[in-house]
Structures are given as structure tokens and as C-alpha cells.
Amino acid sequence: MTGTNQSSVSEFLLLGLSRQPQQQQLLFLLFLTMYLATVLGNLLIVLAISTDPRLHTPMYFFLSNLSFVDMCFSSTTVPKMLANHVLGTQAISFSGCLTQMYFVFLLVDMDNFLLAVMAYDRFVAICHPLHYTAKMTHQLYNAIPHFFCDVTPLLKLSCSDTQLNQLMILTEGALIMVTPFVCILASYIHITCAVLRVPSTRGRWNAFSTCGSHLAVVGLFYGTIIAVYFNPSSSRSAEKDTMATVLYTVVTPMLNPFIYSLRNRDLKGALRRVVSRRTFSV
């Protein structure tokens, strides 16, 4: 019986986005600023909706959940990267890597399904306004060239053939992504048909404008996901993968509260009341 030389991996090294010290300092400040903006922006959305009884409706319920998920999403990846920079280490344990990867996939899926439910909410509100309340009440319903443990760079570390793993991930990802995306598409097809029947141009514009924020978030979310996970590996570089991943793990959660509150008069009013209440209490 011949012996074989085997070794086990106990930790990985996260190489980050740059190895240049000057760039690392700049990236640290940039990601710290974006992370704080993400947490504060989404936290304000959650507080505004939870403390204002006028916003206790299905649309704002889903929005507050999306803000909470976005806050958790950024907290899964960015703090570890910032901590590694402060501590001067690039290591992440094997169990820590798997845990981070698990929560990234969990929160991406939650974002995915929340966007689909929000599209259905807009569909019911526009196409079936008289049944909206009845339908939407809760009574009826090694070295990783990356800055977090993403599955694509992790599979590249394997010494064995990973084609089957990649096929399974692509198939499962397609099923998870396609089902909500089809719901979103169907909702907006019905919305478009209903809006086009509105006689006045102003009425059509007002109806479409209620969906603008959601469409912007859907475009950002699905655009970056498709760019990262549904392109052939040979056609893109690790750097492009990393930058696309930064978009959906850091930039999109940061932009969501601004996108949703920018054109929403009720939400802006609730935010002003939250800020003024906190200011006077201090």
C-alpha cells in the first residue's frame, strides 16, 4: 500500500482589490464611506417606515425589508475587508469563508425574491386597485483574488475538475434568478398594458413614475448579477469579475435608499420627521 502526500486547507488569503499601499489607503476610505452611507441610508429608511403609521402599507413593508437585507448584505462582506486592512492581515478561516459565502448567497436570494414581490405589489396596485388591500394584506399572504468569499474565485482554487460544480451553480442560479425575473417581467407587461389604456398622457406618466424606482433597482441588481455569474469564465478577467461584484454587494445596497426616497414624497416626509425627532431628543 503506497502512501500519498495530502494536505488540508485551514484558511484562505483574501488578496483584496489592490496590492499597492497608496491604493489600499484610498480604497479603505472609499469603502468605509460607502459602507457607512449604506448602513445609515438603509437604517433611516427602516426607521422612517417603522415609526410612521401612514407608511404601514405593503409597499413600504417590502421596502423596509429590502433596506434591512441590503444593510445585512453589505455587512457580510465589507467589514471583513476593512478589518483586514486595519489589522494588516489577509487571512480568513475555512469556516469563516464558508459562512461568509453562505450569507452572501442567502441575502442575494432574499433580495431577488423581494424585488419580485415588489413588482407584483406594483402590478396589483396599478392593474387591480380595487382589490389591492384585500390581496396584499398579511392576513392573506488558499489565496482568493477577491475581497470576500465568492464562489467563482473559490472554485478556481480547486485542483480537481470543477465543471460539474459550475454547471450545478449555473443551473441552480438560473432557476432561482429566472423565476422571480419572470414574475417581474409579467408584472410589468400587465402594468404597461394597463397604463397604455389610460387616456391622458399625464395619467400614463404618473402611473409609470410610481415604478421608476423599482425598475432602477431591478436593472442594477440583475445587470450586475448577469455580468458576474452568467458570462463564460474565459471571456472575462478576475478584475472585471471583482468590479462587477463590488457593484451588487456594495454600490447597489448603498444606492437603493436614495433611489427609493428621491421621488417618494411620503417617504421623504417620514425621513424628515425621523431626523427632526432624533435631533430634538438630543
Residue ranges with predicted function:
Residues 1-282:
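Transmembrane helical core of 7TM receptor-like proteins
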